[in-house]
Amino acid sequence: MTSLRPLETSLSIGGRPRRGLVLPPPGVGAGVLLRRGAMALPGRRGFACRGRSAASAAERTKEKKRRDSSKQPLVHLQVCLEHQVKFGEHVGIIGSTKELGSWEEQVELEWTTNGWVCQLKLPGETLVEFKFVIFLVGGKDKIWEDGNNRVVELPKDGKFDIVCHWNRTEEPLELLGTPKFELVGEAEKNTGEDASASVTFAPEKVQDISVVENGDPAPEAESSKFGGQWQGSKTVFMRSNEHLNKEADRMWDTTGLDGIALKLVEGDKASRNWWRKLEVVRGILSESFDDQSRLGALVYSAIYLKWIYTGQISCFEDGGHHRPNKHAEISRQIFRELEMMYYGKTTSAKDVLVIRKIHPFLPSFKSEFTASVPLTRIRDIAHRNDIPHDLKQEIKHTIQNKLHRNAGPEDLIATEVMLARITKTPGEYSETFVEQFTIFYSELKDFFNAGSLFEQLESIKESLNESGLEVLSSFVETKRSLDQVDHAEDLDKNDTIQILMTTLQSLSSLRSVLMKGLESGLRNDAPDNAIAMRQKWRLCEISLEDYSFVLLSRFINTLEALGGSASLAKDVARNTTLWDTTLDALVIGINQVSFSGWKTDECIAIGNEILSWKQKGLSESEGCEDGKYIWSLRLKATLDRARRLTEEYSEALLSIFPEKVMVIGKALGIPDNSVRTYTEAEIRAGIVFQVSKLCTVLQKAIREVLGSTGWDVLVPGVAHGTLMRVERILPGSLPSSVKEPVVLIVDKADGDEEVKAAGDNIVGVILLQELPHLSHLGVRARQENVVFVTCEYDDTVTDVYLLEGKYIRLEASSINVNLSIVSEKNDNAVSTEPNSTGNPFQQKLQNEFSLPSDIEMPLQMSKQKSKSGVNGSFAALELSEASVESAGAKAAACRTLSVLASLSNKVYSDQGVPAAFRVPSGAVIPFGSMEDALKKSGSLESFTSLLEKIETAKVENGEVDSLALELQAIISHLSPPEETIIFLKRIFPQDVRLIVRSSANVEDLAGMSAAGLYDSIPNVSLMDPCAFGAAVGKVWASLYTRRAILSRRAAGVYQRDATMAVLVQEILQPDLSFVLHTVCPADHDPKVVQAEVAPGLGETLASGTRGTPWRLSCNKFDGKVATLAFSNFSEEMVVHNSGPANGEVIRLTVDYSKKPLSVDTTFRKQFGQRLAAIGQYLEQKFGSAQDVEGCLVGKDIFIVQSRPQP
């Protein structure tokens, strides 16, 4: 799956180092990346530490250990490994001290644009041995570095950093006395945790908010937000106008470019300085776009601006003279365009996601920066008489002149370096000079919008009302309490958890205030000062999102220190306090995602559910199950939904960025490393990443509580075959050279797949997403005797990946799934419950329904009373006239259901539960109608010719696809005659909404259900004959989709034998829809019916919609109902009579905290018992196990379809 789950798994098992001895996997490459600008700055002092032999190192280590470790001072060490790994792989450090896992467990490093980074607190005057490893989260295996252990001798105390390269274990380790890399993300917050890892906080790093005694923020000279991200050229101070044409080496490659990408690259080539590059972006964003082009323009702009701000695209002087007010004016125009898009009616969640990534890279346009001569303080500083002449010249030529002629991000970097230089030795320079330069630095950060969170919040204080100021003050106060925790020793982890929670809550409150102020959008007539303040508000709320990333990461680290998932699972029975706190943290994290515009309704629903389940606690029991079981099962559904939200976010980024990053990166000459790691850095830099990590901890704990193995079995059985991985089950997804049996690992499914159509040699499927058991895909797999299981748990999936390419045995039962490598290939590749019916066309269709005489008699009477169509023709039939011969098995079954429904009011189960149900009114457009329409349109000859060709057409060369499209094009334009519409109007009320459904002669048969193979079109009306006719044409045309053609070919059915009738029924507006199997599909227990239930229309169940339904197991004979799963589909499909009858449905976000089936045990039990009674009744009347579809409308159960259960 394209998600936060690891994608690459070709890891071998490495050995454990024992004093320099390692067992690396053979052939492990060591692709080393060289980061630009990685050299230490001038004047940096450090000392080199040579690699030593592990034997001598061990002796010195023993001597060190004899000292009293409790009195040893600490060394703060930041480690950076410059190495590229595959997406999904992680890097860890493991070593000889307890802080490094004592060679047992690695400490995870976190990805940044500068490499893999972690911050450690280690005892001073200690000899440390260590190595780096590569691993997958949840996996047990590691790839170790080659060579001897690395050895470093730490000084007594201090703060240092070291830079390492994979497999270069003999390289000298230089301890630099000041951090080479600015701490990013949680690294700057985790100094209080032993061996805690930093987390990417890539473009938006957050500085601490200092506070003074009265609780107000206190300004200080903090470094800029993107200084530590700088990957441009090293600052060179000039004492004269020595600007050279440094851009001469740049290369632009416009090969293959067109549209927006070409315009951007050509614009960059013609624009040397920053304001001209900003103008290129403004020109692109101000154009009129359709929805897709707008997203492309935003993505290219976001990538381009980020590379400018990080120095990977350099800015130079071009001989012109434009003060920073030029940049500010352009920025205001860009900001206005972005804000108009942000709240546009057609703006998508993806658009908003990218817009938010552009904002931090725009300069400020406050009035002081749009003035004719802005940022004049540096001019006064450059002409001071109390500083040396050479220093004055360097400031004048490197900063002042450059800034006032062609300002760019490099000016802020130069100013940072100069400030560090003049403050390095107190008293070396005039105090007033240092003070003025520090103030100028703050002004420059303000211009570049690169200030810390505190500085940004300070800038909006004047615009907050009284209540807003109170919320801000509360946040600052809680932040001060958290700062005190950072300096406290031996503080209880539970206390730390509570303080972090309080800070998260106050942060969320403050961000809520800002979002409410922004949600009204930008007025067209807004004055310039209001727009400038709006920019500050926007940047503040973005920075608060960034800081929530830091806090949530610290929360997770502290939770792990308390025992993580194991502690949570252990505490369920006796105390849910830690659960409550952790769930509150998750809700806050999801709220931050909502504030950022990503699937807001979904975030709100998930938050409501978590809070509701938390409030319910363990009080609710069901049957013999205690409250812990129902609580866990319900919470599992919502946690899976929350995890799905994060995966969809990462999938969105993967669909948005990689291709465009590659295109524009190549064209602009960006280093390959930056291109390859761009998207992963974006995924790991967002709050969604931390929400995903917290979900993982909670999911693991819930699995332990439930005793879940992570597998879900749709079709039990045993299969032997080579394990292969494909993205989807599609014809052509397997190489034609593969003839032996295969078991597929499948990333995604949409419910439209035919397993055997992708290959007759497919004997088993492992799907990496949740899927309803009784979905169309599940039914087809069962009918095709394909062992089918699903799994979404990362650790289990990781283990499965390791078997790829091996010949394996997949054994799936109702209680467990086993995967194992087998040495000898088994001739019996698959063993499931076989179908006894064989080829459906070897049977007589009229024997499909054998009904008792008490039902046959009412049917015969109904036939005698009705008349067929208009003037005796068969333009349409009443449902009571439908037969297998005239309208197919589905329509005939609906006719039978209408009779059974009239008798069901008198039927009760042994427990006295009524088996009563209703059916919707209906009619049928019979077999032959499509052919008649072809004759009238003059297309019958073309249709017949294409049908003959498709019998022998090949799949591999696309011939089937081409012919299928031609057939559909001919048929989809057909519509039933006017007399059919007139007849149907006599049956249905004038304003009723209808659904037109397929009823082919090749579906709903024992041995060939063809579930979901053909189309149904909901929400049409006879009031609009054209729309109704078009819907009928689509149903007819679905007889010749590629999938339908290949499905019939796989079943040995000639295409000319297939024909289609159309079942027209009143569409219902259900609260719940269900699929019911009257014999348990997992273990074939005839005493148990199993139902899967979804909110709204039943298409959610039939398709491959991601999510799980309510799953109920109901005993026919004793009335016991067991809940096997709670629903977590994100959306329900509904039809409103007040809306247009256009063949479309409305999708609404579901909040299960408001659904009776989730919150009411009694309702769930009664509903399950009614389904069991109805299922048993239908099974008895039809004489075999049934696959039943129906719904609940108010208090009435409707049955819309019943077919033989595969």
From Swiss-Prot:
InterPro entries: ATP_grasp_subdomain_1 (IPR013815), Carb-bd-like_fold (IPR013784), CBM20 (IPR002044), CBM20_water_dikinase (IPR034848), GWD1_pHisD (IPR054481), Ig-like_fold (IPR013783), PPDK_AMP/ATP-bd (IPR002192). Its EC number is 2.7.9.5. The active site is at H776 (tele-phosphohistidine intermediate). The keyword Cytoplasm does not apply. Its cofactor is Mg(2+). SMART domains: CBM_2. GO terms for molecular function: ATP binding; carbohydrate kinase activity; metal ion binding; phosphoglucan, water dikinase activity; starch binding. One of its GO terms (biological process) is starch metabolic process. The N-terminal domain contains the alpha-glucan binding site, the central domain the pyrophosphate/phosphate carrier histidine, and the C-terminal domain the ATP binding site. The reaction takes place in three steps, mediated by a phosphocarrier histidine residue located on the surface of the central domain. The two first partial reactions are catalyzed at an active site located on the C-terminal domain, and the third partial reaction is catalyzed at an active site located on the N-terminal domain. For catalytic turnover, the central domain swivels from the concave surface of the C-terminal domain to that of the N-terminal domain. May be required for starch degradation, suggesting that the phosphate content of starch regulates its degradability. Homodimer. This is Phosphoglucan, water dikinase, chloroplastic. It comes from Oryza sativa subsp. japonica. The gene is GWD3.
